Amino acid sequence: MLLDIDVEVFDGDDHVPVIEILTLVARGRHDWLPTTLDALRAEAFVAKLHAAKLKAPALKDWAMKASEAAADRSSSAVPPIGGPRSARVTSGNVGLAADDLGKPAVLVVENRIGDGGFVRAMAVALNDERVVHALRKRWLKFCHSGGTGQMADLAIDECRDFSVLVRVAMLIDSDRPDAATPSPNEDKVRKARRGGVPHIHMFTWRMVENYVPFRVWEGHFRHKEVKVKDLRGWIPQQRGYRHLKHHFVGKDGKMPSPLMPEGLTLSEADFHELGPDVVAELRQVLAMLHEIL
């Protein structure tokens, strides 16, 4: 998560939460891009800790690099544009912020294995190193809702674990049978927003399975070549709203699990093959995750 730290926190009476936050930044879990003056304040704060015999070599090394990076940014003719919004840390909320920032960010999904595996494979394929690293380090966790029925309530409940920096997002299927039909899950999205869930993405197409590349289905259903061929033959607007479970195994059949097989390396081209807008939408999902990481 990108932080906006008020340097007044360095003058407070309780240094513990400040040290905790700076340590998280030094380890690369969160980001802070201070101005040159703010970086110097941070470096002075870390120097005082060192003088007080508090051994924190990682912080000392980070503070020096942060000052150098701030100087480089100030001399740049082109300021950075875009990126995630910053989270404000002040002397008034630093303790609560430290607690929130030390917890894993939460993505509420219908199925932890299926949807979670898809998000992981998607992040690798689209070269989102931040999300991949966060998943590897368990800085981002999946919360399993077991379907859409209680998803909003569960996401709202997850938000209660945070005090000032709510790091929760929700990823939900639209369950739409076609592009013209409103999603039956719109009410769940509205309920989640009213309950304080800050980040929600509803898939444009029917469900997560509709975003799974052809290569995955070819591996799962080697004995159903005609079914896979039919899938490839549909235009994106047809394929995106088909119920793929019914297509491959029938209403009462069982889909492969895990959805995204381990060991299969996918690329951006595999997702782009599904339709011209697919990669852009998946990058929106990743951008949402950056907001809570």
Task: Give a label for each model feature.
Residues 1-86:
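N-terminal extension/subdomain marker
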Residues 17-20, 58, 207, 230, ...:
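Exposed alpha-helical structural elements
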Residues 63-176:
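RecA-like P-loop NTPase motor core
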Residues 122-126, 215-216, 220, 289:
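Generic structural signal for hydrophobic core residues of well-folded globular domains
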Residues 178-181:
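Extracytoplasmic/secreted cell-surface and envelope-processing proteins
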Residues 183-261:
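Activity-critical C-terminal alpha-helical subdomain
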Residues 240-293:
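Terminal low-complexity/disordered tails
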